[in-house]
A protein has these predicted regions:
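Conserved MFS/SLC helix-loop-helix module at the cytosolic interface between two early adjacent transmembrane helices
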Residues: 54-91
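Helix-to-loop junctions at the C-terminal end of transmembrane segments
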Residues: 56-67, 256-268, 351-352
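Structural signature of the two symmetry-related core transmembrane helices
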Residues: 70-84, 271-285, 364
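Paired small-residue
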Residues: 92-101, 293-301
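Cytoplasmic helix-loop-helix junction between adjacent transmembrane helices
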Residues: 97-136
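Helix-loop-helix hairpin linking two adjacent transmembrane segments in secondary transporters
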Residues: 122, 131-179
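Juxtamembrane intracellular "pre-TM" segments in multi-pass secondary transporters
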Residues: 179-210
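C-terminal transmembrane helical hairpin of 12-TM major facilitator-type secondary transporters
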Residues: 270-313
Length: 395
């Protein structure tokens, strides 16, 4: 029934999230080739996610005025056509182009959920939304695995070129397949009214707690995957291409995110959230081990639990926010990607100063704070045993 919509949205997720993380697997090589520290190399990821975070709310406002389809198509195409990355002659130019990609990518996560909520029958929204999320997951995976694989026989510039080529294909599929909107009603929104709605959400202590969790979760997740390559190539002596295979553990998150809904039905949101954070901490603690197999198992557990926690928290935002839910969702993703940008960059300095053990302690400290926040939310927010539907703007 919704084949073209599904094809288009999966393509948008693949194209945009492929572009978003295409340098993450290359950080050790960038450090060596461009003679920069891990923290500086990580700016090729942090600049992208930071600019994405700053652009999500403006992109959402623009989509309310000019339509979701236009924003999604422009976002997917421009993010991939900014594929001048392989031509970058300096780290400064590379970081600048990556920041521009972040602005371009923002249109997809800012509007995709709203498009599906408006155009898909409510009965089918969860299934179609799940396929879109799967597309973003596989897109993020391909953006990491493709360049790391190409590194086995070519330079990082060719690795990025290969990633961009794949993203362009999916961007044009999105442009061809995405149907015209039938139920969209333009709204004359202003930045002032939108930020006023967001300010009301920030003043809500339960929503602020959920936003903070998004910041801490994503910060820890991206930090781990930003710098685990240095551990795998340095301590364990793996090649860059083999080390890139660690990103296949990302697929455990595709499974755990879908299982989170089942677990919520059985145990409630609070228990699933706290259990997921504890699992993340156990997985992180295992990374103190000097053994490769133990480290892989730790990353596997951490990744699966991260996606479960993200699924719970993002759904809970729509429950706690009884009005202006679109703005609450935008604020959630703003904090989510700012965590990636800020914590990811700071973690590079921690790694440079205190090496791997210091990085693990730093990330565990953030997860300990997240545990306390989760316990606060569990005490102050009713925990339902139903999976919330995607949030709609209830104004």
């Amino acid at each position: 029934m919704y084949r073209k919509v599904i094809l288009a949205m999966v393509g948008a997720g693949l194209a945009s999230f492929n572009a978003l993380y295409c340098t993450q697997a290359l950080l050790p090589v960038l450090s060596e080739d461009l003679h920069v520290t891990p923290a500086t190399a990580s700016l090729t990821v942090s600049a992208t996610t930071g600019m994405l975070a700053l652009s999500i709310i403006p992109a959402s406002i623009i989509s309310e005025r000019f339509g979701r389809k236009r924003v999604i198509m422009l976002s997917a195409l421009s993010a991939t056509l900014l594929g001048l990355l392989p031509l970058s002659m300096s780290v400064g130019m590379l970081i600048t182009l990556r920041g521009l990609q972040g602005i371009a990518v923002a249109g997809v996560p800012a509007t995709a959920m709203a498009y599906l909520s408006e155009e898909i029958h409510p009965k089918h929204v969860p299934q179609v939304m799940g396929l879109y999320v799967a597309g973003t997951s596989v897109g993020g995976l391909s953006g990491r695995v493709i360049p790391s694989g190409v590194l086995e026989f070519a330079s990082w510039r060719w690795a990025l070129a290969a990633t961009v080529a794949v993203a362009i294909i999916f961007a044009f599929i999105t442009s061809w397949a995405l149907p015209d909107q039938q139920r969209f009603q333009p709204k004359r929104l202003t930045f002032r009214s939108e930020f006023s709605a967001i300010a009301q959400h920030v003043k809500n202590p339960r929503l602020s707690a959920l936003f903070t969790l998004a910041f801490l979760f994503m910060g820890a997740f991206v930090s781990l995957y930003d710098y685990v390559g240095y551990r795998l190539t340095g301590h364990f002596g793996l090649s860059e291409g083999v080390a890139g295979a660690i990103f296949f553990l990302y697929l455990s998150g595709t499974w755990s995110a879908t299982q989170a809904g089942t677990m919520i039905h059985k145990f409630g949101q609070a228990r699933v959230l706290v259990g997921s954070i504890v699992g993340m901490m156990i997985g992180m603690a295992v990374l103190f081990s000097p053994e490769l197999i133990s480290s892989i198992l730790g990353i596997l557990l951490f990744t699966a639990c991260f996606f479960a926690a993200h699924s719970v928290v993002s759904g809970w935002v729509g429950v706690v926010a009884t009005t202006n839910r679109a703005e609450a969702s935008s604020m959630y993703f703003f904090c989510y990607y700012m965590g990636s940008s800020i914590v990811g960059w700071l973690s590079g300095h921690v790694l440079h100063s205190w090496e791997w053990g210091g990085l693990v302690v730093w990330l565990l400290a953030g997860l300990a704070i997240a545990t306390m926040i989760a316990l606060f939310i569990a005490r102050t927010t009713p925990s339902t045993r139903s999976t919330p539907s995607p949030a709609r703007d209830s104004r």
